[in-house]
Amino acid sequence: PKKQGKSELAAAVALLLTCGDGEERAEVYGCAADRQQASIVFNVAADMVRMCPALSKRVKILDSQKRLIYQPTGSIYQVLSADVGNKHGFNTHGVVFDELHTQPNRKLFDVMTKGSGDARMQPLYFLITTAGNDTKSICYEIHQKAKDIIEGRKIDHTFYPVIYGAEESDDWTDPKVWKKANPSLGITVGIDKVKDACESAKQNPGEENAFRQLRLNQWVKQAVRWMPMDKWDKCEFAVSEDDL
């Protein structure tokens, strides 16, 4: 879910791949639906460099280009523009993919993860995302693969899945479910803020799906729900032809 430290973790991984993996002229790329979104993780990484004397001596920050250069090995961490899905020829050592659920199609994902790192000894593709509402998307495809591996239906030793989220059958109003979905609840996000958001969603059905998606990391069928399905189901009753 939102505000659980995903960007900070991704920034640390990007810096490790760029500066600490022993790879000469490593190419590490930050990807998202647009350059602005991809810059979020980059900006966190740049701040980490500035706060670390050892890194700040060795890493050149080119803010205007959204590029970090680790000078001892000539390695780079580069934010890519949104149209990179039309380009090829990357020699990728690492990719940090932010908010995968916002990808409009699978083109960028395929370009960056299918073969671009084959010439590297140990390429890593690090994907972070909140749940979305498009079950035909590349993000949902990856989400289902992750669940299948976690639950033992599939085996892929190259894929390490981590999912924090509520199950479809969980009570979305239960604070225990909030904690299950938000590992840093009470640290980066105060429980009172989640409680207030939940109460608002109870009073305004149109907010329920946003709460489920953004606070509980649940995949929903639409961004806005006009009526909770349990209330819709209660409207079912027999109708005779005479009544019609």
PLM region spans:
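Phosphate/NTP-binding elements of NTP-utilizing enzymes
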Residues: P1-L244
